[in-house]
């Protein structure tokens, strides 16, 4: 199946699921306007109310472990995942496809979301309720109201979403303007605070199989394109044999991470190399939990590099189709100005950049530090400051 076919299939799937959720939620959303709120109940949700990840996950865990006066719940409308999470964390996961789940969501004084998907669908759901949209990272590519290929129906969806959200999170004043333009908000609805997901970057590294301390570990995380398959090592002079020789000689391992739906698109001849492996999004679902184990990041347009900048480690950018991507998707900022790292055009240049990243990791440190002031909050405990804000609003 072609990548574009996969994308369309997923779009229809999520559109259908969202439509069902909206229809089944409407009576409860209306009832919600008049129901009594419980200040101690906080309901969290992530993508399509089906995943346990991103900013919502990390703030939820903070409340669960540290704020004992609150009753946090996470919406997981996926039976298998919900049961797995209940076994791990306890009875803190609800299904808003059920009457019981809907009723609990209605009672909550506070909703925390990472996408625009709310625990219940509807309009004006922020009425007598605090609804904070945390997002799932600082947007680099055109998103929402700034998408170059955005359809009218999607823009309408974002306009409707505005009626449900009290505040949308941004790491800095600078990125606040980006978020404001993407969602179509006014400045007064932007909450400047560090992102909960970045807190884990400063914690102790996880010990996982295949990550040895005597190697330089590189995360290669390109972003998917709607218009074409991803080209790995996109150089005309690329040599598979030479790549393996260099990696083996220099004790470098490259870990490739794709969107989970397209991992099968990774060329098998690459994965057969001893020093290249798949860092599967299916196995390692939350990349933030593992970001600090990597010494170098290779990407193109993935906003993961904003988070990686907090580590002040070297990055290599491979924007091989920059003009096409900018024309089709667009960017929220000047790409070349705000990407502090080498951008090789040939395989020979790439090898030089890779070795420089290994042997001279401080090359771009000053540039990264300066850009961090614009792109990232340097708060190492953003969950605490966000919790203080929430308590002050309810």
Go through each PLM region and give its residues.
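Conserved catalytic-core segment of nucleotide-activated headgroup transferases in glycan assembly
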Residues: 53-64, 190-192, 196-269, 344, ...
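Donor nucleotide-activated moiety binding/catalytic core segment of transferases
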Residues: 94-110, 260-306
């Amino acid at each position: 199946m072609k990548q574009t076919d996969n994308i369309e299939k997923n779009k229809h799937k999520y559109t259908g699921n969202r439509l069902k959720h909206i229809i089944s939620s409407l009576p409860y959303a209306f009832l919600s306007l008049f129901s009594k709120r419980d200040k101690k109940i906080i309901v969290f949700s992530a993508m399509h109310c089906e995943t346990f990840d991103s900013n919502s996950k990390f703030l939820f865990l903070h409340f669960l472990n540290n704020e004992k006066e609150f009753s946090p719940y996470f919406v997981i409308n996926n039976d298998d995942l919900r049961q797995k999470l209940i076994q791990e964390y306890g009875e803190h996961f609800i299904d808003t496809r059920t009457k019981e789940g809907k009723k609990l969501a209605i009672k909550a004084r506070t909703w925390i979301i990472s996408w625009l998907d709310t625990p219940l669908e509807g309009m004006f759901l922020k009425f007598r309720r605090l609804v904070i949209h945390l997002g799932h990272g600082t947007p680099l590519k055109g998103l929402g109201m700034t998408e170059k290929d955005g359809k009218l129906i999607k823009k309408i969806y974002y306009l409707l979403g505005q009626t449900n959200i009290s505040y949308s999170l941004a790491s800095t004043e600078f990125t606040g303007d980006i978020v404001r333009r993407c969602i179509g908000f006014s400045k007064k609805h932007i909450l400047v605070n560090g992102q909960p997901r970045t807190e884990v970057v400063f914690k102790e590294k996880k010990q996982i199989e295949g990550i040895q301390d005597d190697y330089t570990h590189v995360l290669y995380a390109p972003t998917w394109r709607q218009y074409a398959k991803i080209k790995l090592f996109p150089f005309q002079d690329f040599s598979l044999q030479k790549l393996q020789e260099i990696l083996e000689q220099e004790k470098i391992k490259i870990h490739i991470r794709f969107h989970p739906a397209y991992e099968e698109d990774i060329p098998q001849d690459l994965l057969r190399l001893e020093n290249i492996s798949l860092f599967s999004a299916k196995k390692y679902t939350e990349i933030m939990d593992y970001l600090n184990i990597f010494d170098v990041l290779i990407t193109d347009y993935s906003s993961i590099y904003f988070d990686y900048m907090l580590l002040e480690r070297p990055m290599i950018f491979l924007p091989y189709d920059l003009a096409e991507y900018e024309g089709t998707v667009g960017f929220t900022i000047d790409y070349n100005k705000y990407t502090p790292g080498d951008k090789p055009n040939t395989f020979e240049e790439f090898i030089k950049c890779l070795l420089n990243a290994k042997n001279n990791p401080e090359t771009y440190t000053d540039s990264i530090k300066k850009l961090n002031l614009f792109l990232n909050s340097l708060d190492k405990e953003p969950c605490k400051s966000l919790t203080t804000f929430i308590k002050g609003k309810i």
